[in-house]
């Protein structure tokens, strides 16, 4: 059973491919035996490649791979599958999502793919540009943002939430406990290490 983000990934792919190619693309639960297929998600990928593995991908790692009978777009977790779809649309078809209301979706009636074998795990676990338009859940997911300020629902694969968010220096490193032994961890004001009203 596909997760909400994997279902959303397939729907987004079909929507954008329809815009790009100018013809209908449908989401199907079973592969078409006479046409090339795009396999979205790790379970679908195993239909195309029986030894397909998500080992080492974590929640957000992606695989974009051509196979003899089509294309695999899958991730280590549901959010990873969504990111695989958006990365494919961006890197191989030229889509861009500039803001929640402005995007570039090119017209390509014919799409030819060379061999692709991409396996990528994001270097940064938490990605959150902090500006109003970035809080839009669709824009955030399409641009692979996953911070707690974004309006990301289950269909977007959720988000990372860290306790404290901001203004957390003293709760994390209480000066009563650490200042005497590690003054270098605290602000230097006019050449003096201080902890009174010196941190956010």
What do the PLM-derived regions correspond to, one by one?
Residues 1, 6-24:
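Mature N-terminal segment immediately following signal peptide/propeptide cleavage
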Residues 22-30, 100-101:
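Surface-exposed patches in mature extracellular/periplasmic domains of secreted proteins
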Residues 8-12, 16, 54-200:
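Feature activates predominantly on carbohydrate-active enzymes
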Residues 26-53:
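Short, well-ordered secondary-structure micro-motifs within conserved domains or adaptor modules
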Residues 2-4, 43-46, 78-80, 136:
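Solvent-exposed loop/turn segments at secondary-structure junctions
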Residues 3, 29, 41-43, 75, ...:
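Alpha-helix initiation/capping motif
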Residues 1-6, 33-42, 72-73, 127-132:
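Short hydrophobic beta-strand segments
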Residues 11, 22, 42-49, 85:
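Intrinsic disorder/low-complexity segments
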